[in-house]
Amino acid sequence: MREVIMGYQGEMSLKGLNRNQFESAMMKILRYRLKTVGKFRVYCTQSTFYMEPEEEDIDMDLAFDRVKTVFGLAALSRAVVCEKDFNTICQTAEDYLGDSLHGIRTFKVEARRADKSFPMTSPELMRELGAYLLGKHNYLKVDVHNPDFKVIVEVRDYGAYIHGPKIPGEGGLPVGTSGRALNMLSGGIDSPVAAYRMAKRGLGLDHIHFASPPYTSERAKLKVKALAQLITPYTGSTNLFVVPYTKPQEYIRDNAPDVLFTVLMRRSMMRIANVIAKKQGCEALVTGESLAQVTSQTVKALQCTDAAQDLPILRPLIGMDKTEIIETSRHINTFETSILPYEDCCTIFTPPHPKIRPELDEILEAEAGMPGLAQLEAEAAENAERIRIRITDDVDFVG
């Protein structure tokens, strides 16, 4: 009895002539995720990815955990493969899934015969295998509409694959197939969720964080690093750029109108992010902004922010409310870390009554009165610290 992991395509199967490129990217990602677990053969046929261990004693629980968060898979199964012989299929189904049939009342057999050379039709295989399992578990009843458990048999080119119910995958597209962007990782709830949602659309990501010591602490920086690590099961390995932002932030505080401070700071950050993004080959910036969530996220304020640089700014949370964002943060296991009470440079020096609808003309006028800001921004970008975040790294931060 040989166990395998099966991953089923979703949106990828609709890609037409480009489909091979997406499948190749997916197989590369799956191989990378599995290489620290053991040696696997990874291939794709009939819209399904197969991950077959080529070594003995591989931890299949760990292997499944490594691939279940890969974007591009609509569903996954842990299956066993056996010879395409009816008696062998029956015995293998009982050996592999028999324990799962204890303690339930109803079940159903589903069969798919992709290999038409198999002598039984799909309905015949369902009926006969169901009868065999009923003979082994006479307390069970068949319920084809709402069973407690499904036994699924897929007769394919390379054998008969037997498994229980499919487990939903993350869907989306393989990371990297839609380009690369730089995500503004603040340390709050929103920005990790923004990274997750854009990675789901196939976008490869690096992160940028702005630190303002002594106003922000080393613990705050470690918290952001932990967030970057927590989302690597979805984004894959990535880079985190930590920008020393104290001097530009103090300069804006000391030389700009108080009510415009927040928007001016956001524009300054965008300019620095633009420089680093282009050096890394990124084609866009990603933020966790949600419309009207805070005063710097009104349409007017966002318009002023966008005008500071020339890369597209992607805002995947723009129409989400806080409850939806929090639900996603819990799903990706970042919520508890995000709410740890460490300083965020976006909240220091915040004026009590910032302007909600700033005009671009007044923003440009305020920046004209800060001739030294460009040099401080250039120095901050040049001195950014690059931290490599790998998917196998342990999250070692404890709040």
Annotate each PLM feature.
Residues 1-182, 192-238, 307, 355-360, ...:
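RNA-binding accessory domains that recognize and position tRNA/RNA substrates
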Residues 131-133, 166, 172-178, 245, ...:
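Active-site adenylate/phosphate-handling loop in enzymes that bind or generate adenylated species
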Residues 188:
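Conserved G/P- and acidic residue-centered "switch" motifs that form tight phosphate/ATP-binding loops
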Residues 228-254, 342-344:
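A conserved beta-strand->alpha-helix junction
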Residues 333-341:
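A short alpha-helix-loop-beta-strand transition element characteristic
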Residues 357, 361-378, 382:
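Glycine/aspartate-rich loop-and-adjacent alpha/beta segment that forms the canonical ThDP
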